[in-house]
Amino acid sequence: DVPKVTISGLPLVVIRFDDPDINYEKTLFDAIGTTVDKKSDATFGLVAVAPIGKNEGETRINSSKVKKYAERVLRSLVSFGLPSKKVALTAKTSGDVVVPEVHIYVQ
């Protein structure tokens, strides 16, 4: 049963992929670790946010890129020891972002 993402409040972590080689793992590890220490049954919502492009094709490319980034972040979370069943994944497009972003919410 795939958990659903509830987007409310501010994200715990925002990873901006303006550089595809961004080093986000330490920040992510610390944030997840602190959250799990406080609430051992915490679950997380991972939201891939793609910028709206100048046309439909560009928006599609942005969506495809950000989904790959989100999968990379999910693999990082699992490598930290977080069970994949504790992470729900979803995607959206937004006019509020200019580069692909991955937002992580505590559920």
Regions found by a protein language model. Give the residues of each.
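Periplasmic peptidoglycan-binding/tethering modules of Gram-negative envelope proteins
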Residues: D1-F44, G95-V99, Y105-Q107
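Periplasmic OmpA/Pal-like peptidoglycan-binding modules at the C-termini of bacterial envelope proteins
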Residues: E71, R75-Q107
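Short amphipathic alpha-helical surface patches that serve as generic macromolecular interface elements
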Residues: I15-F17, K67-L74
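Short, surface-exposed beta-strand segments enriched in small/polar/acidic residues
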Residues: L10-V14, T34-V66, L89-T93
